[in-house]
């Protein structure tokens, strides 16, 4: 592999760890003690801000109304119990994934399932932003000198969680279990101590620095509903366990249901306990210190023997709030992978990374959350208004889907199970309506607008993928049945240098009957190249000098347009490039060549063979040419590349496929045999789901003899605009990988999807 590309790979190994094989996926499954901190940290940690969120709203009616926070919290706790009971049934019915998207898709249809998916994706991003910002607030509440760095600290926390999650599910579980359990213990101690003091003597009184101003309004039904909606943020995170059933150890459904039960017990106890103490200690919302911090300081006052417990509570509140974001880092990538599998978003989201996690989903979630934190300056009170809409939309659709499931299947106990899910659907629907009405003008409108826009995008992506799949499948037979292909080769000549010598050798190898040499006189090119050309090549072919006024790309295209092109007529443009060093930046400096390659890529029947050569690293003169076609399957794009390979008439020509599993290897062997393409197929396994390493090892085995050069032909789908992001990520990776690989030349065989 090129030295220019080694440092990023080494850095990835340091931060992410050694890659794991697909066969190790079973080892990554989680027991309940590890699953709880991974999937339930969000719901458990919400005790740190849900009570305060309700109190901020109640403050609008004056200080005297803050006591209403306790009955509101009890109502939220009842709602949480209903939702968790409903989800315990859901995970038993859908043992691989009981998330809202799957349940709604199977029982309510495509549109409701996409509404649930879009709402959840938005909510997962908001969960990261709110949790991390709340965690940083817990620290700056204790160390007030840091309160000017909330945004920077929050962004750093997002980066840390991202790296940990890229290292794998099980490793993140071990990392996050310790602080999560210590938070639960410290909060139980704080709640127990506070309740004991209130029951046996006078309740301690909280001190509130920089309190928020109290309003003078009346405590009407609208304000009560708004406060209830804010407190309902305590329910966020419950969905993640249902989405992640397949991450549990077997029996998966049973273990997921047990984890939900533990979550209900812990979260309800802590939430109601904190609300009780917040009311009894007269804590009130502050611009600098959280309500939980005030309660902890009141229960463990400075100077007392237990004052150190205040710092324990603060430190682990910070830790669990930061780690609560991890719930989204489990849910978002899994949901994205399901959507990608159904072709509603880019297929890259289905790719497992080195550590058997959906790495693309992890990175996208981190980027979106970081952007929100930066825009809102890590202000929890501003972010919280965007919260909850998405999760309660998903709750409602999931529970409604389960009602339909029981009525449709009549499974065991359906007569009493359906009403449980029905009550859950009704309760969460009421909360969703309340949230939309009460928080619409404060930011919820953005979520309401974002969800339909996302759904439009989902349908657009699916239409594109379905059309491409149909075209590739239908076109495969026509490509295979095409008559024997012919090839015309053109070599672009800028100067007489070692890169040109390699290009001429390749042109003679793929067009022994002759080829054309074109020179476009441009600023910086060799003005005296024509008389020296004859002696350099021994007379043939003649150098054709084009009109330099058109520019390189237009002059070459004008010649290409004059040649026959089609399924059986190809034009190969060989482009020599001489570099001073193995640097990706050095290629970017060749703007004219890049523009030419980009223009030629959209021309039907035109193949660009890029021949990069590093000055001073030439090696032995090549003697043998081998052709290898990288194929993804039996489709029109791969078969066109095979047709082109046969037109080159190189004796040692083969197709190569890198399979991520033995099942995939068997499947492509069967497909290849049934379609009987004109060249043999070799299949190599890539157990780490990255074809880079296996591809390099395969090529190194061929080029171990320095007289051999391998021409790698790579099918590449060509489309326009934003659709480019839906294709060819692997092709771009291979281009970077092989750019400076010794004795390897890469040529793209385009398949146009421009309409």
Tell me what each language-model feature is.
Residues 1-53, 85, 96, 104-106, ...:
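Membrane-interface "cap" regions at the ends of multi-pass membrane proteins
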Residues 183-210, 275-282, 398-411, 460-469:
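Hydrophobic alpha-helical segments and their helix-loop junctions in multi-pass secondary transporters
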Residues 209, 348-359, 395-432, 437-440, ...:
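C-terminal membrane-solvent junction of multi-pass transporters and transport-like membrane proteins
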Residues 195-202, 258-295:
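Extracellular/periplasmic helix-exit of transmembrane alpha-helices
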Residues 1-24, 469, 473-477, 482-755:
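Cytosolic C-terminal regulatory domains/tails of membrane transporters and channels
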Residues 181, 186-236, 438, 442, ...:
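Helix-loop-helix junctions that connect adjacent transmembrane segments
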């Amino acid at each position: 592999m090129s030295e220019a590309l080694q440092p990023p790979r080494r850095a990835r190994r340091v931060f992410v760890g050694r890659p794991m094989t697909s066969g190790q996926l079973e080892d990554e499954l989680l027991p309940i003690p590890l699953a709880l901190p991974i999937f339930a940290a969000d719901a458990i940690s919400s005790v740190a801000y849900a009570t305060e969120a309700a109190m901020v709203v109640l403050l609008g009616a004056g200080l005297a109304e803050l006591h209403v926070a306790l009955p509101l919290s009890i109502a939220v706790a009842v709602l949480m119990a209903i939702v968790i009971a409903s989800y315990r049934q859901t995970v038993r019915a859908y043992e691989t994934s009981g998330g809202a998207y799957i349940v709604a898709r199977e029982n309510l249809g495509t549109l409701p399932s996409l509404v649930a998916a879009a709402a959840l994706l938005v909510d997962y991003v908001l969960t990261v932003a709110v949790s991390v910002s709340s965690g940083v607030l817990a620290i700056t509440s204790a160390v007030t000198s840091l309160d000017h760095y909330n945004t920077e600290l929050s962004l750093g926390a997002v980066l840390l969680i991202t790296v940990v999650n890229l290292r794998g599910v099980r490793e993140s579980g071990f990392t996050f279990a310790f602080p999560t359990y210590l938070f639960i213990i410290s909060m139980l101690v704080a709640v127990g101590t506070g309740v004991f003091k209130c029951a046996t003597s006078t309740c301690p009184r909280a001190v509130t620095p920089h309190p928020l101003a109290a309003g003078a309004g009346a405590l009407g039904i609208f304000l009560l509903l708004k406060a209830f909606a804010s407190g309902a943020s305590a329910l966020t995170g419950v969905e993640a366990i249902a989405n992640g059933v397949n991450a549990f150890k077997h029996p998966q459904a049973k273990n997921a249901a047990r984890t939900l039960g533990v979550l209900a017990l812990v979260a309800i106890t802590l939430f109601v306990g904190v609300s009780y103490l917040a009311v009894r200690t007269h804590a009130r919302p502050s611009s600098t210190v959280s309500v939980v911090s005030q309660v902890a300081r009141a229960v463990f006052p400075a100077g007392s023997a237990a004052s150190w417990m205040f710092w324990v509570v603060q430190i682990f509140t910070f830790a669990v709030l930061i780690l609560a974001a991890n719930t989204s880092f489990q849910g978002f990538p899994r949901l994205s992978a399901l959507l990608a599998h159904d072709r509603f978003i880019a297929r890259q989201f289905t790719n497992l990374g080195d550590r058997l996690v959906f790495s693309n989903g992890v990175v996208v979630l981190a980027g979106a959350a970081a952007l929100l934190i930066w825009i809102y300056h890590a202000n929890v009170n501003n972010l919280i208004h965007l919260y909850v809409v998405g999760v309660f939309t998903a709750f409602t659709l999931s529970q409604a889907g389960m009602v339909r499931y029981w009525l449709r299947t009549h499974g065991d106990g359906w007569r009493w199970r359906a009403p449980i899910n029905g009550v859950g659907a009704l309760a969460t629907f009421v909360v969703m309506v309340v949230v939309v009405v009460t928080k619409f003008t404060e930011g919820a409108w953005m979520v309401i607008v974002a969800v339909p826009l996302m759904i439009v995008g989902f349908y657009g992506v699916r239409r594109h993928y379905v059309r491409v799949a149909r075209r590739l499948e239908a076109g495969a037979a026509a490509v295979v049945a095409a008559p024997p292909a012919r090839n015309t080769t053109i070599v672009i000549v800028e100067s007489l240098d070692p890169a040109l010598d390699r290009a001429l050798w390749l042109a003679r190898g793929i067009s022994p009957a002759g080829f054309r040499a074109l020179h476009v006189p441009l600023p910086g090119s060799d003005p005296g190249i024509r008389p020296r050309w004859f002696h350099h090549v021994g007379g043939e072919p003649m150098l054709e000098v084009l009109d330099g006024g058109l520019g390189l790309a237009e002059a070459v295209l004008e010649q290409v347009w004059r040649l026959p092109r089609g399924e059986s007529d190809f034009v190969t443009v060989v482009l020599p490039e001489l570099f001073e060093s193995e640097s990706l930046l050095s290629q970017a400096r060749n703007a004219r060549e890049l523009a030419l390659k980009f223009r030629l890529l959209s021309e039907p029947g035109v193949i660009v063979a890029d021949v990069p050569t590093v000055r001073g690293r030439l090696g032995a003169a090549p003697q043998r040419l081998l052709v290898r076609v990288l194929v993804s399957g039996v489709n029109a794009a791969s078969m066109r590349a095979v047709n082109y390979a046969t037109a080159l008439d190189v004796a040692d020509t083969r197709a190569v496929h890198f399979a991520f599993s033995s099942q995939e290897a068997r499947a492509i062997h069967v497909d290849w045999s049934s379609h009987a393409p004109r060249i043999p197929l070799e299949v190599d396994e890539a157990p780490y789901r990255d074809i880079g390493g296996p591809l390099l090892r395969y090529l190194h085995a061929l080029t171990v003899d320095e007289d051999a050069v391998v021409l790698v032909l790579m099918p590449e789908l060509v489309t326009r605009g934003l659709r480019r992001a839906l294709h060819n990520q692997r092709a771009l990776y291979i281009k970077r990988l092989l750019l400076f690989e010794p004795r390897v030349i890469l040529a793209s065989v385009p398949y146009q999807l421009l309409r």
